[in-house]
Regions:
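A generic structural signal for alpha->beta connector loops
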Residues: 20-22, 74, 146-148
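Catalytic-core segments of class I nucleotidyltransferases/pyrophosphorylases
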Residues: 49-51, 58-71, 83-86, 97-186
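Short beta-strand-to-loop element that shapes/binds the nucleotide-sugar donor at the catalytic cleft/hinge
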Residues: 77-95
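Short, high-confidence coil segments that cap the C-terminus of an alpha-helix
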Residues: 47, 74-75
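Conserved N-terminal catalytic core of the sugar/cofactor nucleotidyltransferase
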Residues: 1-54, 65, 163
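Residue-level detector of conserved, well-ordered beta-strand and adjacent loop positions
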Residues: 26, 94, 102
Length: 186
């Protein structure tokens, strides 16, 4: 699909084969934080659970498993938790002597928000359309305190793309035919 907003606000469909998805692109404001952005799209959502992603993470999250867990949990929001590997290796030490090197283990107990979420429309009650509303602060913290925030623990591949280094790593995986997130033919 090509969207051409330069003159005629035209959409061109290049192939007739498509998933049964509804995609809405909304300008929520250049300086609007994450919570304000979600609140500003409320009128497009409807009454069903919806999926949200930040768009700067690449993963092989099983979206069906995420959705099924969300539905069975009764939570308002279910986020995908991941355990990122350490960026730096760990030194094994005995006193002032290095005795070995190893990668930082994922299993150090720390989980982070991987950025793939399922939300019930009830989440809008926790959000403000103001530019400064940050989803990860007051809204998600309130849901957590109320026991309404769930986690889907994703054991598979996840990589953020925040830096040129991240971009280069992901491109290297793709170009080498080792992209765990690739589904189907491209």
């Amino acid at each position: 699909v090509t969207f051409d907003f330069s003159q005629e606000n035209r959409m061109t469909v290049h192939q007739n084969v498509a998933e049964p998805w509804r995609v809405t692109l909304v300008d929520t404001g250049l300086n609007t934080q994450t919570g304000g952005r979600v609140k500003r799209v409320q009128k497009y959502i409807g009454s069903e659970p919806f999926m949200l992603t930040y768009g700067d993470g690449v993963s092989n999250v099983d979206l069906n498993a995420l959705l099924n867990q969300h539905r069975s949990s009764g939570k308002t929001v279910t986020l995908t938790g991941i355990q990122p590997g350490g960026r730096f290796g760990v030194l094994d030490l005995e006193g002032q002597t290095v005795t070995g090197f190893r990668e930082k283990a994922k299993e150090d107990g720390g989980w982070i928000n991987g950025g793939f979420m399922v939300m019930n429309p009830e989440v809008f009650d926790y959000l403000s359309p103001e530019e400064r509303c940050i989803l990860e602060r007051t809204p998600l913290e309130a849901l957590a305190q109320e026991g309404k925030l769930g986690i889907y623990k994703h054991p598979g591949f996840w990589q953020c793309m925040d830096t040129q280094r991240d971009k280069n790593r992901l491109e290297s995986l793709w170009n080498g035919g080792n992209a765990p997130w690739k589904v189907g033919e491209v």
